[in-house]
Curated annotation (Swiss-Prot):
Classification of source organism: Eukaryota, Fungi, Dikarya, Ascomycota, Pezizomycotina
CDD domains, A to Z: Chitin_synth_C
Keywords (A to Z) from UniProt: Cell membrane, Glycoprotein, Glycosyltransferase, Membrane, Transferase, Transmembrane, Transmembrane helix
TM segment ranges: 659-679, 699-719, 733-753, 776-796, 808-828, 908-928, 945-967
Region spans: Disordered: 1-153, 189-229, 994-1019
GO biological process, one term: chitin biosynthetic process
Localisation per UniProt entry: Cell membrane
Its membrane topology: Multi-pass membrane protein
Organism this protein belongs to: Exophiala dermatitidis (strain ATCC 34100 / CBS 525.76 / NIH/UT8656)
Entry protein name: Chitin synthase 1
Length: 1036
């Protein structure tokens, strides 16, 4: 009890001496926990926070009846005696309120200590008000702590000199004894009442059983959204801020709690958030003199990697999934300590730009996540600056914390390194193309990065995905774009595959990443670099001096209006990520190529409902179709490039492959019907009917009429209904198509088994039914098995075969829906070139306005002033009726012309699509009626073998991609090992002795560095020179 006092911690701001309450040691349970290297943080309010009352005014906590309280009124009370009051613990049987974090606990038992001095030690702030946390006069002037509110049962006329008797520690009436009464005999206050009753006059004693008392009902709980209690409301004040070059630029301190657990506070970029109100178009950002932190002061740095994250109205879970993945990738860059480009301070060469498309559209919880990281602060943005409308709000901050998907903080203790962030909050919703214009033309021109990476919110990149993308540019200076592998998010424990839509998309993504992307990468032209995970070389995107180039063509789709907006061009820009691909490869006098990087993968959410799935594929299919047509029509541009002859020949081979694929896509509706017609119709033959009694024929006739009617219904639905409004109808058609596909698959399997077990269908050579030739075994079995077998083979070669077992059945069941539902809906909505975000939000002001004056009860309006004006208007109305004055017709608006043009083109496209498929289906079905021999059906043979040939072509290209990667890896490893042995083990000093700069590590901006001996040739250039016989794998 009388041991030496604990040492006190005196803040440095107490220049004249500490106040009396600092002598009390701080209890662990009452202080805010700020761990140094723990993964979890307790963000508790500080002691200086002001709190609103968290309980109703007529309700008193039971704990308050056991507290000593003064009977004086607060208005006339001098100093509080609580500075010498003991902390009286409660009995374990009594209810107790939780300890308030804002109240320091007193654990000292020295009750004979003199009262607190009346001199205040803390200086006031610049406004003369007490500092936060300093007891002010409104609490009675006590330096101990803010006093609680006055007791509800205190008498109003209490004497000022009334105090509570405090016994000595040796007294027989110990305050820690249960039967000690803490109330004086002459206390004028009313007697204490039961904790659960406010109507009786009985004193609350130990004998009272409060558990059996009847509780009073205080009405129902409040409805609707309630303000959170216990938090201090933001107090806004007016300040004079000097404009910088006529623009509003603010340096705002970060929140105190965030500042308290930051590992680094030595630079202003860690302690202040920079806000800029941009009032110009993104193309004029640099011209108007706007600068980013990387362009000014001590934070002036070169940017090697510029990451763009675009979002619309996604929630905090999707945002944190993407952002935490980026933070893990930046940590991996910093872990590469042997690199000349990266290393410990590699984060200084990486800038992350988050662009939100519309201030009113962004999700509030996403803003909360950004605020928790210190990037965003509410209440400082303005709509108008210096009579100029703000177009974008730019927030800059170097954050040191990250939020994972579970919204838990991760800091330096988990390997998180600082991250330079730019948050661009666009004032209006202007679609994704405009967001990319802010990224490339505004911030890109200010930073001049080497590589730009594009991500969508919701995509979770692997911890090394961004490094592998960057490495593709570092190894080959001719690479202009790189595509990563997109994987479907299968959910926890792959439970998402129980949804057939998710499973079918998982299979589709896998086959594309195993067969299609590697094939196109070998040729050097990838038809689509996915916007969810792709990268571009910033220098390759730039326009020529005349203003013509990839970016100018890319952003053309943002300004298309009226009849000048070609419907083909408008639809092509729905899949905007396909535009840059063609423009880069076909750039005049250049030799840029595109590359697929399989090791750079990321997971993304896929649509799991029918309306969302159809709407997404409508944009993709239309954009892919019209972009492919555009590339095929303009293939001559390849001859104006600087590509080698071998590369040009390979590109033309790819164009032929794309043309064949485009034809199959256009006639896919007829091919599906004919395949069903011939295969399912074979069971109508009585000789092979599996059911007998002509049941196979009846089933075929029914399914045939259902299929035809369903296709007609699909056109009607697609022309007149949205998927969101006719969800059940679209779902019903997809289920029916799956039933038809299931019966067709059953017929194929039955025919194959029948062919392999009996000779009933093969009359030409009964001794050898398995020979190759024009028979069922060759045309049906070999072609089908070869197609599916190639899928299995390539999946096993890439060591990723699980989708064949978990998702292939769902994909083949939904394959008719891909053709008949998605393709038909896409062609029937070619006129719709919007993203579903437009609306008539223009306010018309031709009628004037009623302006409020005074207190708001009266308004000011314009009305006819004289009776003559009223009579004149009436006379005009009568004269117009009598003379039948012709009313001039308003001219057709620009929007109406555009809509009419788009709908007319839609009509031509749908009519051509429908008529061509109908003619093909009718002609072939008439040439080969039902019951004809499948082995002699030339068209079915052509279809089956064409599919097998295309699959084989894709498999050969995919295999070549794998072989090239293996050869490049072996050559690169051998050359690097050789130079490390010659030049001192490959360390930095050895490379400088050889005059190679950083060419045999991560080099620099273009894959070529400025060494002294060999002009800093990168490792890929040396490898390319040694392996000239593989010239088609290099960039030349």
């Amino acid at each position: 009890m009388d041991g030496p006092p604990s040492p006190t911690r005196v803040p440095p701001s107490y220049t004249d001496g500490p106040p009396s309450y600092v002598d009390t040691p701080i209890a662990d349970e009452d202080t805010m926990s700020v761990p140094g290297n723990n993964s979890s943080l307790r963000l508790l309010p500080q002691g200086q926070d002001e709190y609103r009352s968290i309980s109703p005014p007529n309700r008193v906590s039971p704990d308050r009846y056991h507290r000593p309280a003064a009977s004086t009124a607060y208005s006339s009370r001098p100093g509080s005696s609580l500075g010498r009051a003991p902390s009286i613990p409660l009995s374990s049987s009594n209810p107790r309120s939780p300890i308030r974090p804002s109240t320091p606990s007193r654990v000292s038992t020295d009750w004979t200590r003199p009262p607190a001095p009346s001199v205040a030690y803390e200086p006031p702030d610049i406004n003369g008000s007490p500092r936060p946390g300093t007891p002010s006069s409104q609490y009675g002037g006590s330096p101990r702590r803010p006093l609680p509110p006055a007791p509800l049962f205190s008498a109003k006329g209490a004497a000022a000199e009334t105090t509570i008797p405090m016994p000595e520690p040796e007294s027989e009436n110990d305050v820690f004894v249960d039967n000690y009464s803490i109330m004086p005999d002459n206390d004028p206050r009313a007697s204490l009442k039961s904790a659960h009753s406010y109507t009786t006059d009985s004193t609350f004693t130990e004998d009272d059983d409060i558990t059996n008392e009847k509780l009073n009902h205080y009405g129902p709980a409040p409805e609707g959204r309630q303000d959170r209690r216990g938090l201090r409301e933001a107090q806004m004040t007016k300040k004079e801020v000097r404009l910088i070059n006529g623009e509003l630029i603010l340096e705002c301190k970060i929140p105190t709690i965030l500042h308290s657990f930051l590992p680094r506070r030595d630079e202003r970029e860690f302690t202040h958030m920079r806000y800029t109100a941009v009032t110009c178009d993104p193309d004029d950002f640099v011209v108007k003199g706007y600068k980013l932190r990387q362009n000014i002061g001590p934070t002036m740095r070169e940017t090697e990697l510029f990451i763009c994250v675009t979002m619309y109205n996604e929630g905090e879970i999707e945002f944190t999934r993407t952002m935490h993945g980026i933070m893990r990738n930046i940590a991996h860059f910093c872990s590469r300590t042997r690199s000349r480009t990266w290393g410990k301070d590699g984060w200084q060469k990486i800038v992350v730009c988050v662009i939100a498309d519309g201030r009113q559209k962004v999700h509030p919880r996403t803003l909360n996540a950004l605020a928790a990281m210190g990037v965003y602060q509410d209440g400082i943005a303005k709509n108008v600056v210096n009579q100029k409308e703000v177009t974008a709000h730019v927030y800059e901050y170097t954050t040191q914390v990250s939020l994972d998907e579970t919204l838990k903080f991760k800091g330096a203790e988990k390997g998180i390194v600082p991250c330079q962030m730019i948050f661009c909050l666009k004032e209006k919703n202007k679609k994704k193309l405009n967001s990319h214009r802010w990224f490339f033309n505004a911030f890109g021109r200010a930073l001049i990065p080497n590589v730009c990476i594009l991500l969508d919110v919701g995509t979770k990149p692997d911890s090394k995905a961004l490094y592998h993308l960057w490495k593709a540019f570092d190894q080959n200076s001719n690479v202009a774009g790189a595509a990563g592998e997109i994987k479907a998010d299968k959910g926890k424990g792959w439970l998402g595959l129980l949804n057939p839509l998710v499973a079918s998309q998982n299979f589709e993504y896998k086959i594309s990443n195993i067969l299609d992307k590697p094939l196109e990468s070998v040729f050097g032209y990838i038809t689509v670099l996915p916007g969810a995970l792709s990268a571009y070389r910033y220098h390759a995107l730039q326009n020529d001096p005349s203003g013509h180039g990839p970016l100018s063509q890319y952003f053309k789709g943002e300004t298309l209006h009226g009849r000048d907006a070609d419907v083909f061009t408008a639809n092509m820009y729905l899949a905007e990520d396909r535009i840059l691909c063609w423009e880069l490869v076909a750039k005049r006098d250049e030799q840029w190529v595109l590359k697929f990087v399989k090791s750079a993968y990321g997971e993304t959410d896929v649509p799991d409902t029918v309306p969302e799935f159809i709407s997404q594929r409508r944009r993709w299919l239309n954009g892919a179709f019209f972009a492919a047509v555009y590339a095929l029509v303009h293939f001559k541009q390849i001859w104006r490039t600087d590509h080698s002859l071998t590369r040009k020949i390979l590109l033309h081979i790819e164009f032929i492959y794309q043309f064949i694929s485009l034809l199959f896509t256009f006639f896919s509706l007829a091919n599906f019907y004919l395949t069903f017609y011939f295969v399912a119709g074979s069971l109508a033959d009585p000789t092979i009917d599996p059911f007998g009694h002509n049941i196979g024929k009846y089933i075929f006739v029914i399914l045939r009429y259902v299929c035809v009617l369903l296709i007609c219904l699909q056109f009607i639905l697609s022309l007149g209904n949205r998927p969101q409004g006719a969800k059940k109808l679209f779902l019903s058609t997809m289920v029916t198509y799956s039933i038809i596909m299931a019966y067709t698959t059953f017929a194929s399997v039955y025919i194959v088994i029948k062919q392999l077990t009996t000779h009933a269908l093969e009359k030409t050579d009964p001794n050898n039914p398995y020979k190759l030739g024009n028979n069922i075994f060759t045309n049906l079995i070999v072609s089908s098995v070869s197609t599916i077998g190639l899928f299995f083979l390539m999946s096993f070669l890439y060591l990723d075969p699980w989708h064949m077992f978990t998702s292939s059945a769902q994909y083949f069941a939904l394959l008719p829906s891909y053709i008949c539902t998605l393709q038909v809906y896409a062609f029937c909505n070619t006129h719709d070139v919007t993203w579903g975000t437009k609306g008539d939000n223009v306010m018309h002001t031709d009628l004037g306005a009623a302006k409020a004056i005074g207190s708001g009860n009266t308004v000011e309006v314009e009305m006819p002033s004289e009776q003559l004006d009223i009579d004149s208007a009436y006379d005009v109305a009568l004269r117009n009726l009598r003379d039948r004055v012709e009313v001039p017709k308003p001219p057709v608006s620009e929007n109406q012309l555009q809509e009419d043009y788009y709908k007319s083109v839609r009509t031509y496209v749908v009519a051509s699509y429908m008529v061509c498929n109908a003619i093909l289906a009718m002609a072939v079905s008439e040439a080969y009626p039902v019951g004809s021999h499948i082995g002699s059906n030339f068209y079915l043979t052509f279809i089956l073998w064409s599919v097998a040939a295309l699959a084989l072509f894709r498999a050969i290209g995919s295999s070549a991609f794998g072989v090239i990667n293996i050869v490049s890896a072996i050559a690169e490893g051998r050359i690097q090992a050789k130079f490390e042995r010659i030049f001192g083990g490959g360390d930095e000093r050895g490379r400088h002795r050889a005059g190679l700069g950083s060419g045999f590590s991560e080099s620099g901006k273009t894959g070529i560095t400025s060494g002294s001996g060999m002009s800093g040739m990168s490792l890929s250039d040396v490898t390319s020179k040694i392996s000239e016989k593989f010239s088609w794998m290099s960039g030349k």
